[in-house]
Regions:
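Conserved catalytic scaffold of divalent metal-dependent phosphoesterases
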Residues: 102, 106-118, 130-134, 142-144, ...
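Active-site neighborhood of phospho(di)ester-bond hydrolases with catalytic His/Asp-centered motifs
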Residues: 26-30, 51-58, 77-80, 137-140, ...
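Metal-dependent catalytic neighborhoods of phosphoester/phosphodiester hydrolases
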Residues: 64-73, 88-89, 220-227
Length: 249
């Protein structure tokens, strides 16, 4: 049975461990290596058990812990253009080509990726399917959710998706105008409303588990993110705790 451990979430760093039986994969390694090691051990996972690390994109809050790969000789998957900002030994690098559609097998997992929209070379989301049919979609930094992304993520049992900000809080923040524009752009981050609207097209009321991640400490409030998603799903007749299960990480 698939088990999810969200080791870190937010602008300070992101890392997600996905495991079933003795197989463990890591999505992003965005906190210091020593912190990842400690949090893995707290979750009952030895770092040397990790089969592979899959990178969404090469911003610091997603890759700063990759010395973990060098220490434990863990293969790292990323798109080819991201390697200029990733410091991993050459023999551990596994590149996705820019226009390639690839499937990676780590029994009992099948891992596929889809393109997202962020201000990096070629950012990705991932869909992890267990051989029993359980399906996890991970969509972190992206400025919008398009139809291809929705198609890739549909019929998942678990969604880990960013709900980064509330636009009104961004507008009154102390951030420079250029940073505000970046956050709100189509290659920035999802607002609570954008996340809610995407989930409204994905959730089928089958008891899906939803984790809202990557919340901005300055431009969001957990209760606001929850309320926004719940309100949109309520319009479809779905109730949190009955038709789906929602929490903020």
């Amino acid at each position: 049975m698939m088990k999810i451990d969200i080791l870190a979430s937010g602008s300070g760093g992101n890392a997600i461990a996905v495991r079933s039986g003795s197989t463990v994969i890591l999505i992003d390694a965005g906190i210091a290596r020593t912190k990842i090691e400690r949090r893995l051990l707290d979750a009952g996972i030895r770092p040397d058990e990790i089969a592979s690390i899959f990178i969404t994109h090469a911003h610091k809050d997603h890759v700063q812990g990759l010395p973990l790969a060098n220490k434990y000789r863990i293969p790292v998957f990323a798109t080819e253009g991201e390697w200029k900002d990733i410091h991993v030994d050459q023999e551990l690098r596994r590149s996705f080509l820019k226009n390639e559609v690839a499937t990676i097998h780590h029994y009992p997992f099948t891992i596929k990726y889809f393109r997202t929209h962020h201000d990096s070379y070629d950012s990705l989301g991932y869909v992890v399917t267990e051989d029993n049919g359980d399906r996890l979609s991970i969509c972190l930094d992206t400025g919008h959710v398009d139809s291809d992304m929705l198609e890739a993520m549909h019929w998942s049992d678990i969604y880990i998706i960013e709900a980064n900000h509330d636009p009104e809080l961004v507008a009154v923040s102390d951030y420079p105008d250029s940073v505000k524009a970046r956050i709100l752009s189509d290659r920035g981050h999802l607002s609570n409303q954008q996340t809610a609207e995407a989930l409204a097209r994905l959730v089928r009321g089958r008891g899906e588990r939803i984790y809202l991640t990557h919340l901005s400490k300055s431009n969001n409030i957990p209760e606001l993110a929850l309320a926004t998603v719940e309100a949109v799903l309520q319009r479809k007749g779905y109730v949190n705790g009955k038709h789906y299960f929602l929490e903020v990480v």
